[in-house]
């Protein structure tokens, strides 16, 4: 039995009146498979699914809000390193596209990296760092931003002197990174 299934079973063993599932990562998504369909449930995050009640983050608005300040700083465009898109249009990548469109900027192709694959994000940073026209990057989450910064530094680009990079989620470890 895998650990997610075991943890769900343990939680259900106390006979809860309902469950709250945080659908932000693979474990949260996998947990949905093991929860009985008749169990009252609230799903937080993720995308629109079958749950009776859901709390959906303003992912698209967030992507726009992260991109606009970079454009306000005078960057001609903002490149994006993101995750695979969900089944709805409520994505950070679409918010990034919205911001660029609002300013009349043609969106460059985003670099999509697999979830939780930091090495691919480092490679994306190297790839973007080798381009002379990259001055701003919106990373889809903080982990991706840190990995992109590493890739940029590996090819001699300075952050923020040469390239502005923003992440998303405001994870507490972000303050530990320089």
Positions of predicted regions on the chain:
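Beta-alpha junction/loop-to-helix N-cap segments that form part of ligand/metal-binding clefts
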Residues: 24-27
């Amino acid at each position: 039995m895998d650990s997610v299934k075991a943890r769900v079973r343990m939680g259900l063993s106390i006979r809860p009146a309902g469950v709250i599932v945080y659908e932000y990562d693979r474990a949260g998504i996998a947990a949905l498979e093991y929860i009985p369909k008749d169990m009252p449930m609230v799903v937080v995050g993720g995308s629109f699914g079958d749950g009776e009640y859901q709390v959906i983050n303003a992912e698209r608005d967030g992507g726009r809000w992260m991109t606009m300040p970079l454009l306000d700083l005078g960057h001609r465009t903002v490149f994006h390193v993101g995750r695979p898109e969900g089944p709805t249009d409520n994505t950070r990548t679409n918010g990034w596209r919205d911001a660029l469109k609002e300013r009349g900027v043609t969106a460059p192709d985003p670099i999509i990296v697999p979830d939780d694959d930091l090495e691919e994000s480092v490679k994306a940073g190297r790839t973007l760092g080798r381009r002379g026209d990259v001055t701003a990057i919106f990373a889809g989450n903080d982990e991706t931003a840190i990995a992109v910064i590493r890739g940029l530094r590996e090819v001699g680009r300075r952050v923020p002197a040469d390239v502005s990079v923003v992440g998303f989620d405001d994870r507490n470890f972000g303050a530990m990174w320089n």
